[in-house]
């Protein structure tokens, strides 16, 4: 948004971004969300005001909020395991509800790591503001002016992590001498 006239001008932009992973949401444990998510909101506003013919006021405000959520195991690590472990290496879960694993891949069951290993939630925020007033002093000397400015910056973050463990059972799979999974 932008507009104004001779005495007052403004510009504002708002940007919202949300990226939610293609991975299915954890519905078994609703205490926290382990689905990798990146949410951002950015706002920028500029105001220019001609207070008088020789006095100008400028105000700028920028704010940003960012929230990252996901599995405690890590965003990249979970995808490395999803693509690096064959789908038939072990059962996702055994009939008794215990997660599958193997002597080859250990306890790196991608579903268990995604939904039952814990979560992270990081929230960041920033607020940046500046104000300046400029007074022309042409009545004393042509081209002379005085300007005063002040600014305020505030940046913060909050980090939340939960840990959880899960049971897994070795399915007894191994790799033969010719490289076949047995």
Language-model-derived ranges and their functions:
Residues 1-15, 19-22, 34-108, 118-124, ...:
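Flexible loop and strand-edge segments within Gram-negative outer membrane beta-barrel domains
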Residues 12, 59, 131, 146-148:
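Membrane-embedded beta-strand positions of outer-membrane beta-barrel proteins
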Residues 27-34, 74-84, 162-173, 180:
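Flexible, surface-exposed loop regions and adjacent strand-edge segments
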Residues 42-44, 128-134:
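Membrane-embedded beta-strand positions in outer-membrane beta-barrel channels/transporters
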Residues 142-144:
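Short, Φ-rich (hydrophobic/aromatic) sequence segments
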Residues 148, 155-164:
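Carboxylate/His-rich catalytic cores and anion/metal-binding grooves
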């Amino acid at each position: 948004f932008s507009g104004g006239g001779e005495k007052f001008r403004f510009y504002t932009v708002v940007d919202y971004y949300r990226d939610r992973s293609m991975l299915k949401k954890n519905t078994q444990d609703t205490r926290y969300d382990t689905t990798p998510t990146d949410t951002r909101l950015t706002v920028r506003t500029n105001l220019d005001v001609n207070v008088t013919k020789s006095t100008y006021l400028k105000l700028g405000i920028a704010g940003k909020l960012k929230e990252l959520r996901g599995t405690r195991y890590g965003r990249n690590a979970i995808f490395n395991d999803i693509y690096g472990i064959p789908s038939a290496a072990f059962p996702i879960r055994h009939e008794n509800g215990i997660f599958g694993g193997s002597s080859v891949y250990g306890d790196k069951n991608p579903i268990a790591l995604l939904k039952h290993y814990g979560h992270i939630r990081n929230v960041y925020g920033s607020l940046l503001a500046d104000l300046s007033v400029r007074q022309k002093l042409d009545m004393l000397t042509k081209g002379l002016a005085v300007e005063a400015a002040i600014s305020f910056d505030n940046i913060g973050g909050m980090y939340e992590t939960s840990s959880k463990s899960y049971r897994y059972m070795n399915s007894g799979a191994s790799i033969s001498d010719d490289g076949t999974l047995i």
